[in-house]
Amino acid sequence: MLDFEAVLPAIGRQTVLCVGDLMLDEFVYGEVSRISPEAPAPVIAVQRSEINVGGAGNVARNIAALGARCIFVGLIGDDAAGRTLSAALAAEPLIEPVLVCDESRPTTRKVRFVSAHFSTHMLRADWEIAAPASLMVEQQLIDAILQQLPAADIVLLSDYAKGVLTARLIREVIDAARKLNKRVIVDPKSPNFALYRGATLLTPNRKEFAEATRSRADSQAEIAASAREAIAVADCEAILVTQSEQGMTLVPRDGEAIHVPAHPVKVRDVSGAGDTVAAVLAVMLAAGADWDVALRAANAGAAVAVSKNGTASVTLGELRRKVLPPASLAAEEKIVAAGGDLEPHLVEWRAEGLRIGFTNGCFDILHPGHVKVLTAARGACDRLIVGLNSDASVKRLKGESRPVQDERARAEVLAALEAVDLVVIFEEDTPLQLITRIVPSVLVKGGDYTREQVVGHEIVAAQGGEVVLVDILPGHSTTTLVARAQNGKA
């Protein structure tokens, strides 16, 4: 078995056969400020709406976002929602959709009305028929799955109890997969775990697990004991119980239970977090990870998913940044180009309660004075962002002969330092716009300045932050080094 970083290169070579209930997720965002005069009901002033591939389709999207290939088998109706889903899946380069159309039922569609300000779900409207698929449609699904099975490295059944995963279909797929020595992961909905007998791994949430095992599932000891009984019933290798803010517990048939606490994040939306967990587990196990590595990766994936709005997918880069400590990331992963997206980093760090620090400069030729400022800056915060003047900006500030090194080279040198968590290139002459975007808790500046002279001090102070001044080291400056080099005295 392989550790997390060793698994990553193999992910792109894996194919996951995902089968389950496909649905169209729509999120309508707005604000409620009044009650309808027609009835005692809130009126939502709609600001925007989003449409996403949901249910088992979101599992497929997560698999593809992680870089693996996904063959997806699902069911749609002969309607606009079905056509929207079919087109959306077909547009994903790593997803091969194999969709069966059932004209007798609508495509499952869920519309959620959400407070744009508080990210609170106010109402959900569903269009669905949850009855099992007809015998004819069931056979079409089974035939499609068995035809695709040889091409898969692992099978994932995503059960939302909307009619795709009938008892017969589950049985035929698991039996066929076992004959081909392919592992099967099941995200179950039925409380009868015997239905999934022979699967490799079941991934119920705590509510589903408690219902299936008729236990309270309110302690790790009880979860472990009940899981071992359930493993015998389901004849599976392991059961993973997800527990929202309390983390996850994996109970293998052989060996001790493993519990990992949830990452401390600001929860924006829990929709689809279970999909991410199932997808990460499938991809990691297919790529050669052991239970422990797959569990910790899935836990990290869930943390990223719930920090996003709507039905979210998680990329391999996001997963890697969550699993690995910042200091271990490659330099190029710590660089944001001018105008690039800072939000994922800021959201993640703030959700974890981390103090974000900021300093800036040209950093043309790194010298001990720079190192002193960067070290002091990192010591004053939990995560340090360095604003780096672009080549055009340096030229305007320092003259036509500068910079000596281009912005990419300067950024890579800074990003290689353990003290630096993120390098952000900016085009302006001052970092004011960047500071306005970041609103750091700590603003650090080296040199002979007063607090009032530091660009952006008022923005930081207004949010209760602090400005830290660091004395410069005498005799160290890039301008002096460049002049000495030009005069042959370097």
Curated annotation (Swiss-Prot):
Reaction it catalyzes: D-glycero-beta-D-manno-heptose 7-phosphate + ATP = D-glycero-beta-D-manno-heptose 1,7-bisphosphate + ADP + H(+); D-glycero-beta-D-manno-heptose 1-phosphate + ATP + H(+) = ADP-D-glycero-beta-D-manno-heptose + diphosphate
Could you say which EC number(s) this protein's record lists? 2.7.1.167, 2.7.7.70
Enumerate the Gene Ontology biological process terms. ADP-L-glycero-beta-D-manno-heptose biosynthetic process
Key words, A-Z = ATP-binding, Carbohydrate metabolism, Kinase, Multifunctional enzyme, Nucleotide-binding, Nucleotidyltransferase, Transferase
Which residues constitute the catalytic centre?
A: 275
Q: What class of enzyme is it?
A: transferase
Nucleotide-binding found in the keyword field: yes
Residue span of region Ribokinase: 1-330
Q: Does the keyword Zinc-finger apply?
A: no
Q: Which GO terms describe its molecular function?
A: ATP binding; heptose 7-phosphate kinase activity; heptose-1-phosphate adenylyltransferase activity; phosphotransferase activity, alcohol group as acceptor
Return the protein name. Bifunctional protein HldE
Record the organism.
Rhodopseudomonas palustris (strain BisB18)
Q: State the gene name recorded for this protein.
A: hldE
